[in-house]
Amino acid sequence: LDVVVVNAGRGLAGGVLSSDESQWQEVYGVNVVGAAYLLRRAGQYMTQRKSGDIVVIGSVVGRNVSPFSGFYGSSKFAIGAITEGLRREICQYGVRVSLVMPGIVVSEFQDVAGYNQENFGNAVSQFGKLLEPQAIADGILWLLTLPAHVNVNEIMIRPTGQNYP
């Protein structure tokens, strides 16, 4: 096992006041606790081997919270903090840990998370062409092909026209 990509993502539309509180524990269970379990196991294994790459998929709203996804964004803030904590804990063992924070990607994520015209808006007309999943995969591949002594701790990948968040 050379690479682990932690891509836990359970979205939830709305902020603290408007999101469905019955879903809060599930969001944190998947995005934070579930991801942390995988990070622990991967970190333990890779520190024993003294090599490896761990890539965590966060979100731009984990750095710049949107009022339309404040609760989800808070879970991505949390996994970002855990990722950086793990990086500091295991970097001396030759294990690289990186956080990738995508902007808006064309996928089923928004529908499943409950976003609609009111809380998501017309992203294409506002931001232009949105990201395809391949753009994120290309960013991850770039991280992984850097020399072993180089670790890009964080990378934010947005559509060129996405000025918020």
Predicted regions and their residues:
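Residue(s) in the substrate-gating loop at a strand-loop-helix junction
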Residues: 59
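Active-site loop-to-helix junction immediately N-terminal to the catalytic Tyr of the SDR YXXXK motif
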Residues: 19, 65-74, 85
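C-terminal helical subdomain
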Residues: 95, 99-103, 119-165
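A short helix-coil junction within the Rossmann-fold of NAD(P)-dependent oxidoreductases
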Residues: 14-15, 41-53
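Alpha-helical segment proximal to the catalytic Tyr-Lys
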Residues: 44, 88-91
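Active-site helix of classical SDR
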Residues: 39, 75
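Substrate-binding pocket helix/loop in short-chain dehydrogenase/reductase
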Residues: 15-16, 23-25
